[in-house]
Amino acid sequence: MGKFKMRSKDLRGMSVEELEKTLRELRIKLMGLRYKAKVGLLENPGELREARRNVARILTVLREKREGEKA
């Protein structure tokens, strides 16, 4: 995962398995960023914010896909 905004449009094109894999990777990255922020090593605080928002985007798309399967 690079330092970029994930687009919801791109995420909607991914399968549930791909989204879950990406979510796991992002959560691990987010954990590392939080650690760096805590010890003062985080160079770009915006990266932490962007990672949190990317996690939220993925969770939103996953919820939409799962609700779509039920309907």
Curated annotation (Swiss-Prot):
Alphabetized PROSITE patterns for the sequence? RIBOSOMAL_L29
Q: Which superkingdom?
A: Archaea
Share an example GO biological-process annotation for this protein.
translation
For this protein, the record's Pfam families field holds: Ribosomal_L29 (PF00831)
Which CDD domains does the entry mention? Ribosomal_L29_HIP
A GO cellular component annotated for this chain's UniProt record is:
cytosolic large ribosomal subunit
Keywords noted in UniProt? Ribonucleoprotein, Ribosomal protein
Keyword Cell inner membrane attributed: no
- Which GO molecular-function terms appear in the entry? structural constituent of ribosome
SUPFAM superfamilies in UniProt: Ribosomal protein L29 (L29p)
InterPro entries with a match to the protein in the record? Ribosomal_protein_uL29, Ribosomal_uL29, Ribosomal_uL29_CS, Ribosomal_uL29_sf
Q: Which family does it belong to?
A: Belongs to the universal ribosomal protein uL29 family.
**Record's protein name:** Large ribosomal subunit protein uL29
Which organism is this protein's natural source?
Answer: Aeropyrum pernix (strain ATCC 700893 / DSM 11879 / JCM 9820 / NBRC 100138 / K1)
Please name the taxonomic classification of the source. Answer: Archaea, Thermoproteota, Thermoprotei, Desulfurococcales, Desulfurococcaceae
Gene behind this protein: rpl29
